[in-house]
């Protein structure tokens, strides 16, 4: 009995193949009616459509334009704004030059400040009060408070 049941199963598989062929025939008939025709290479033997070929990746390019697009204005308005911007830039440049002059302190390094052992002091705790007392005893410390003419004068 088991052998008799197998042929009907195989017949049902063949029927499914016929159904798939019929659906393909219907697609071909619809093409004749004016619908778009699919290429035959895209249809597999089982009636399934083949996967589409992978799209080529386009090269990504950097944008060659600024994020903010300048607004179109009349010539008179644009000139006025440019003049105001130039004044602000000059002021900023002058302030930057003053800051640079303050940072250019090129006094010589006092050899007493160099550690004689040559070892690094990273991570060590330095007691500056003891060092200050030691230098006062030696008479090498000068009072910096008297030198500041900017704050003391009125």
UniProtKB/Swiss-Prot annotation:
Keyword terms:
Chaperone, Nucleus
The UniProt regions of compositional bias labelled Acidic residues, in chain numbering, are 75-108, 140-154
Keyword field contains Transport? no
What Gene Ontology terms describe where this protein resides (cellular component)?
nucleus
Region feature (Disordered): 1-118, 135-154
Give the UniProt subcellular location, in the record's own words.
Nucleus
The lineage's top-level taxon is Eukaryota
Decide whether keyword Nucleus is in the record.
Answer: yes
Which InterPro entries has this protein been placed in?
Answer: Histone_chaperone_domain_CHZ (IPR019098)
Bias category Basic and acidic residues: which stretches?
1-54, 64-74
Q: How does it assemble?
A: Forms a heterotrimer with H2A.Z-H2B, stabilizing the association of the histone dimer. Also, with a lower affinity, forms a heterotrimer with H2A-H2B.
Give the family, as the similarity comment puts it.
Belongs to the CHZ1 family.
Q: What functional role does this protein have?
A: Forms a chaperone-bound H2A.Z-H2B complex that acts as a source for SWR1 complex-dependent H2A to H2A.Z histone replacement in chromatin.
What's the protein called, per UniProt? Histone H2A.Z-specific chaperone CHZ1
Question: From which organism does this entry originate?
Answer: Meyerozyma guilliermondii (strain ATCC 6260 / CBS 566 / DSM 6381 / JCM 1539 / NBRC 10279 / NRRL Y-324)
Which gene name belongs to this protein?
Answer: CHZ1
């Amino acid at each position: 009995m088991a052998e008799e049941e197998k042929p009907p199963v195989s017949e049902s598989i063949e029927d499914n193949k016929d159904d798939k062929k019929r659906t393909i025939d219907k697609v071909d008939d619809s093409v004749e009616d004016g619908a778009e025709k699919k290429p035959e290479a895209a249809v597999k033997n089982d009636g399934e459509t083949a996967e589409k070929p992978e799209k080529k990746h386009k090269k990504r390019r950097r944008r060659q334009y600024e994020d903010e697009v300048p607004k179109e204005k009349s010539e008179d308005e644009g000139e006025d704004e440019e003049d105001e911007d130039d004044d602000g830039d000059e002021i900023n440049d002058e302030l930057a030059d003053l800051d640079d002059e303050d940072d250019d302190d090129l006094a010589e390094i006092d050899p007493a400040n160099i550690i004689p052992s040559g070892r690094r002091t990273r991570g060590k705790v330095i007691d500056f009060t003891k060092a200050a007392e030691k230098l006062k005893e030696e008479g090498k410390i000068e009072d910096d408070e008297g030198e500041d003419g900017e704050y003391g004068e009125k």
